Amino acid sequence: MVDETKGSQANILCKSCGLCCTGHLFVWAKLRSSELDSARMLGLNVFGSDPSQRGFSQPCPLWDGQCTIYTSPQYPHFCRTYKCKLLKEVIDESTSLPAALTVIQQAKEMIHDMESLLPNSPNPNFRERLVLELEALQNSDEQDDTNLEFRQKADALLLFYEKVFDVKDLVSKPDEE
Protein backbone atom coordinates (compact mmCIF):
# COMPACT_ATOMS: atom_id res chain seq x y z
CA MET A 1 0.00 0.00 0.00
CA VAL A 2 1.32 3.42 -0.94
CA ASP A 3 0.89 6.00 1.82
CA GLU A 4 -0.66 9.37 1.00
CA THR A 5 2.63 11.30 0.69
CA LYS A 6 4.20 8.66 -1.54
CA GLY A 7 0.97 8.53 -3.55
CA SER A 8 0.93 12.29 -4.10
CA GLN A 9 4.60 12.22 -5.10
CA ALA A 10 3.82 9.41 -7.54
CA ASN A 11 0.93 11.45 -8.97
CA ILE A 12 3.16 14.50 -9.38
CA LEU A 13 5.83 12.45 -11.15
CA CYS A 14 3.37 10.68 -13.46
CA LYS A 15 1.47 13.83 -14.37
CA SER A 16 4.67 15.73 -15.13
CA CYS A 17 6.16 12.90 -17.18
CA GLY A 18 3.62 11.12 -19.36
CA LEU A 19 6.22 9.35 -21.50
CA CYS A 20 4.27 6.10 -21.17
CA CYS A 21 1.24 7.96 -22.64
CA THR A 22 2.88 9.91 -25.45
CA GLY A 23 4.31 7.08 -27.53
CA HIS A 24 7.86 7.71 -26.40
CA LEU A 25 8.21 4.55 -24.31
CA PHE A 26 5.58 2.28 -25.88
CA VAL A 27 3.82 1.79 -29.18
CA TRP A 28 0.66 0.57 -27.45
CA ALA A 29 -0.91 -0.04 -24.04
CA LYS A 30 -2.83 -3.12 -22.93
CA LEU A 31 -6.55 -3.28 -22.31
CA ARG A 32 -8.65 -5.90 -20.56
CA SER A 33 -11.51 -7.34 -22.60
CA SER A 34 -13.97 -5.61 -20.25
CA GLU A 35 -12.38 -2.24 -21.12
CA LEU A 36 -12.63 -2.42 -24.91
CA ASP A 37 -16.04 -0.77 -25.31
CA SER A 38 -15.41 2.05 -22.83
CA ALA A 39 -11.98 2.68 -24.39
CA ARG A 40 -13.59 3.01 -27.83
CA MET A 41 -16.19 5.41 -26.41
CA LEU A 42 -13.34 7.50 -24.97
CA GLY A 43 -11.89 7.80 -28.47
CA LEU A 44 -8.90 5.50 -28.04
CA ASN A 45 -7.63 3.71 -31.15
CA VAL A 46 -8.49 0.20 -29.93
CA PHE A 47 -7.34 -3.06 -31.46
CA GLY A 48 -8.33 -6.40 -30.04
CA SER A 49 -8.66 -9.26 -32.49
CA ASP A 50 -5.68 -11.03 -30.86
CA PRO A 51 -6.29 -11.46 -27.10
CA SER A 52 -2.54 -11.39 -26.42
CA GLN A 53 -2.30 -7.96 -28.05
CA ARG A 54 -5.51 -6.26 -27.02
CA GLY A 55 -5.01 -2.57 -26.37
CA PHE A 56 -4.84 0.91 -27.79
CA SER A 57 -2.17 2.67 -29.80
CA GLN A 58 0.05 5.43 -28.53
CA PRO A 59 0.20 8.35 -28.31
CA CYS A 60 -2.94 8.36 -26.24
CA PRO A 61 -5.38 10.98 -27.54
CA LEU A 62 -6.46 11.65 -23.95
CA TRP A 63 -3.02 13.03 -23.06
CA ASP A 64 -3.13 16.81 -23.20
CA GLY A 65 -0.06 17.81 -21.24
CA GLN A 66 -1.39 15.43 -18.61
CA CYS A 67 -3.92 12.63 -18.55
CA THR A 68 -7.44 13.97 -18.98
CA ILE A 69 -9.08 10.86 -17.45
CA TYR A 70 -6.64 10.20 -14.59
CA THR A 71 -9.40 10.17 -11.96
CA SER A 72 -12.12 8.71 -14.20
CA PRO A 73 -13.64 5.25 -13.59
CA GLN A 74 -12.83 4.57 -17.27
CA TYR A 75 -9.09 4.99 -16.63
CA PRO A 76 -7.65 1.72 -18.03
CA HIS A 77 -6.25 -0.84 -15.61
CA PHE A 78 -2.86 -0.89 -17.32
CA CYS A 79 -2.55 2.90 -17.05
CA ARG A 80 -3.57 2.79 -13.39
CA THR A 81 -1.13 0.01 -12.45
CA TYR A 82 1.91 0.59 -14.67
CA LYS A 83 4.96 1.71 -12.72
CA CYS A 84 8.21 2.46 -14.49
CA LYS A 85 11.48 1.89 -12.64
CA LEU A 86 11.82 5.59 -11.79
CA LEU A 87 8.33 5.71 -10.27
CA LYS A 88 9.08 2.62 -8.18
CA GLU A 89 12.24 4.34 -6.91
CA VAL A 90 10.25 7.42 -5.87
CA ILE A 91 7.67 5.24 -4.10
CA ASP A 92 10.34 3.27 -2.22
CA GLU A 93 12.22 6.53 -1.50
CA SER A 94 15.49 5.48 -3.15
CA THR A 95 15.10 8.50 -5.47
CA SER A 96 13.69 11.84 -4.34
CA LEU A 97 10.89 13.50 -6.26
CA PRO A 98 13.07 16.51 -7.24
CA ALA A 99 15.79 14.17 -8.55
CA ALA A 100 13.19 12.15 -10.48
CA LEU A 101 11.72 15.30 -12.02
CA THR A 102 15.23 16.29 -13.14
CA VAL A 103 15.64 12.87 -14.77
CA ILE A 104 12.31 13.30 -16.58
CA GLN A 105 13.49 16.67 -17.88
CA GLN A 106 16.69 15.01 -19.15
CA ALA A 107 14.63 12.35 -20.92
CA LYS A 108 12.44 14.97 -22.57
CA GLU A 109 15.50 16.89 -23.75
CA MET A 110 17.03 13.74 -25.24
CA ILE A 111 13.73 12.94 -26.96
CA HIS A 112 13.50 16.48 -28.32
CA ASP A 113 16.99 16.11 -29.79
CA MET A 114 15.99 12.81 -31.41
CA GLU A 115 12.71 14.24 -32.73
CA SER A 116 14.65 16.89 -34.63
CA LEU A 117 16.72 14.18 -36.33
CA LEU A 118 13.78 12.00 -37.38
CA PRO A 119 12.35 12.51 -40.86
CA ASN A 120 8.88 14.03 -41.09
CA SER A 121 6.16 11.41 -40.98
CA PRO A 122 2.38 11.26 -40.67
CA ASN A 123 2.90 8.60 -37.97
CA PRO A 124 2.44 10.31 -34.58
CA ASN A 125 4.21 7.55 -32.61
CA PHE A 126 7.80 8.52 -31.78
CA ARG A 127 8.85 4.98 -30.95
CA GLU A 128 7.60 3.56 -34.27
CA ARG A 129 9.31 6.36 -36.20
CA LEU A 130 12.54 5.72 -34.30
CA VAL A 131 12.39 1.99 -35.09
CA LEU A 132 11.71 2.66 -38.77
CA GLU A 133 14.61 5.09 -39.05
CA LEU A 134 17.03 2.76 -37.25
CA GLU A 135 15.98 -0.09 -39.56
CA ALA A 136 16.40 2.12 -42.62
CA LEU A 137 19.89 3.15 -41.51
CA GLN A 138 20.81 -0.45 -40.75
CA ASN A 139 19.80 -1.45 -44.29
CA SER A 140 21.54 1.55 -45.88
CA ASP A 141 25.04 1.65 -47.27
CA GLU A 142 25.37 5.34 -46.39
CA GLN A 143 27.53 5.97 -43.34
CA ASP A 144 27.76 9.76 -43.18
CA ASP A 145 28.16 12.00 -40.11
CA THR A 146 24.40 12.61 -39.86
CA ASN A 147 23.68 8.88 -39.70
CA LEU A 148 26.43 8.39 -37.14
CA GLU A 149 25.06 11.24 -34.98
CA PHE A 150 21.56 9.77 -35.21
CA ARG A 151 22.73 6.29 -34.20
CA GLN A 152 24.78 7.63 -31.30
CA LYS A 153 21.87 9.69 -29.96
CA ALA A 154 19.44 6.80 -30.48
CA ASP A 155 21.77 4.42 -28.63
CA ALA A 156 22.13 6.91 -25.77
CA LEU A 157 18.35 7.36 -25.54
CA LEU A 158 17.68 3.62 -25.57
CA LEU A 159 20.28 3.05 -22.86
CA PHE A 160 18.65 5.85 -20.84
CA TYR A 161 15.23 4.18 -21.33
CA GLU A 162 16.64 0.92 -20.03
CA LYS A 163 18.43 2.38 -17.01
CA VAL A 164 15.76 4.86 -15.94
CA PHE A 165 12.46 3.30 -17.01
CA ASP A 166 13.45 -0.39 -17.37
CA VAL A 167 12.22 -0.41 -20.98
CA LYS A 168 14.70 -2.78 -22.55
CA ASP A 169 14.18 -2.67 -26.29
CA LEU A 170 12.31 -0.95 -29.05
CA VAL A 171 9.69 -3.60 -29.59
CA SER A 172 9.04 -4.76 -26.03
CA LYS A 173 5.44 -5.24 -25.04
CA PRO A 174 4.25 -3.28 -22.03
CA ASP A 175 4.30 -5.57 -19.00
CA GLU A 176 1.08 -6.06 -17.11
CA GLU A 177 1.30 -6.11 -13.36
Describe the residue ranges of each PLM region:
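Hydrophobic scaffolds flanking metal-cofactor catalytic centers in soluble metalloenzymes
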Residues: M1-E177
